[in-house]
Amino acid sequence: MKKIAIDAMGGENAPKAIIDAVLKAKPKLKDIEFILFGDAEKINQLIPNEQKERIEVVATSEVIVDSDEPVRAIRRKKDSSMVVAANYVKAGKADALFSLGNTGALLACGIFIIGRIKGVERPALMPTLPSAKSEQGFNIIDVGANAQSKPEYLVQWAQMANFYAQKVRNIQNPTVALLNNGAEDDKGDPLHQEAYKLLKETKLNFIGNVEGNDLMEGKADVIVTDGFTGNATLKAIEGTASVILRLLKDSLLNNGLRPKVGALLAKPGLTALKKRFDTARYGGAVLLGVNAPVVKTHGRSNIRPIYYTLLQIDKMLSQDLVGEYKKYFSESR
């Protein structure tokens, strides 16, 4: 039976939303044990006695908050829920780490406590985002784990994301593209030009460059980019989506009766659109390249995205994704 180490104190709605999601996922994930780290008194109060089977609570006295400097926090807050959970994974007492807390601290836990897979130059952060073409969306890697990149890093990230798309998203032969400032072969700075050449030489189903305006069109299953560009791209997508949804809601509700009637008539279409661009069902962002699954969900998440992230982690464990990475990179050295 696999065990997921969960930072129960991370995020704005902790610990209640996390525990409610665990209780919702527990009947479906019959081969998973959940280890919750944090304020034991608060956590235990939220778990009915009849639901405590396969749930372990580990008491911790500290919490890493968003304002903490990541590396300093994991060194100084040794008894924080996130750090103790990471050490459980490192010691083999748990098989995966999940948190809604400080992203930088979680990345630091993954890289410095759980550790890199041998042969992986740099771990990278990868979410799944919605696209207009497919309900499965697309993966984009790296979105901020690395401020500086080399062409060889991008190739490894593409290889890891390709495995993920095959094993977790069930895409037999994922298409892989490089995010660049033009579709032509010779576009980009030296980093992207060299990465393009190296990607062409791999066995990946590499389809070339894609531009930023093509991302949401679903032209590729996997988009690889440097961490600086990826982070800026992700935040631009999230910010744009948030503004559009807010403006649409304001337009429909604050301009008299006609827009409200129109919204009622358009409700089936709007519902379908909302479902297509619902990111909750994709789960969390994954730190690929470390010795166990490390997954981050947005700090404002409620029960639903947390629930889907638990299902995502279960799939990663059942498919032995990290084992596949270790085998591949040991053979390629």
Swiss-Prot record:
- Localisation: Cytoplasm
Which pathway, per its entry?
Lipid metabolism; phospholipid metabolism
Cite the Pfam families for this sequence.
FA_synthesis
Which GO biological-process labels does this protein carry? fatty acid biosynthetic process; phospholipid biosynthetic process
Task: Read off the InterPro entries from this record.
Answer: FA_synthesis, Phospholipid_synth_PlsX-like
* Reactions performed catalytically: a fatty acyl-[ACP] + phosphate = an acyl phosphate + holo-[ACP]
What keyword terms does UniProt attach to this protein? Cytoplasm, Lipid biosynthesis, Lipid metabolism, Phospholipid biosynthesis, Phospholipid metabolism, Transferase
Spell out the molecular function terms from Gene Ontology: phosphate:acyl-[acyl carrier protein] acyltransferase activity
User: Does the keyword Lipid metabolism belong to this entry?
Assistant: yes
GO cellular component labels: cytoplasm
Instruction: Show which residues constitute the signal peptide.
Output: none
Q: What's the EC number here?
A: 2.3.1.274
Subunit field text: Homodimer. Probably interacts with PlsY.
In which family does this protein belong, per the annotation? Belongs to the PlsX family.
Q: What does this protein do?
A: Catalyzes the reversible formation of acyl-phosphate (acyl-PO(4)) from acyl-[acyl-carrier-protein] (acyl-ACP). This enzyme utilizes acyl-ACP as fatty acyl donor, but not acyl-CoA.
Protein name, UniProt field: Phosphate acyltransferase
Organism from which the protein derives? Lactobacillus gasseri (strain ATCC 33323 / DSM 20243 / BCRC 14619 / CIP 102991 / JCM 1131 / KCTC 3163 / NCIMB 11718 / NCTC 13722 / AM63)
Q: Which gene encodes it?
A: plsX
